[in-house]
Amino acid sequence: ADLANGAKVFSGNCAACHMGGGNVVMANKTLKKEALEQFGMYSEDAIIYQVQHGKNAMPAFAGRLTDEQIQDVAAYVLDQAAKGWAG
């Protein structure tokens, strides 16, 4: 996966709601490692599925982003979660 591309995709498509790994709509459903683990989302496959299909207030990005962009952003989210979203 291309983490630099994932960062670019995140910035352009995800950061409005998930800046710094947070969640402006549902405060407990963050992209922080603990929350991802708690909700069974701490894997690339789980994140890819969520990005593709959306859930609740989160829109589906399948058809808006390529499979490669979605894979890259999932890898970026996991990488950032492991680093505590410290940059």
Swiss-Prot record:
PROSITE patterns: CYTC (PS51007). The keyword Thylakoid applies. Keywords: Electron transport, Heme, Iron, Metal-binding, Photosynthesis, Thylakoid, Transport. This is Cytochrome c6. InterPro entries: Cyt_c-like_dom (IPR009056), Cyt_c-like_dom_sf (IPR036909), Cyt_C6 (IPR023655), Cyt_C_IC (IPR008168). The keyword Flavoprotein does not apply. One of its GO terms (cellular component) is plasma membrane-derived thylakoid lumen. Functions as an electron carrier between membrane-bound cytochrome b6-f and photosystem I in oxygenic photosynthesis. It is found in: Cellular thylakoid lumen. Heme c binds at residues 14, 17-18, 58. GO terms for biological process: photosynthesis. GO terms for molecular function: electron transfer activity; heme binding; iron ion binding. Belongs to the cytochrome c family. PetJ subfamily. Monomer. Binds 1 heme c group covalently per subunit.
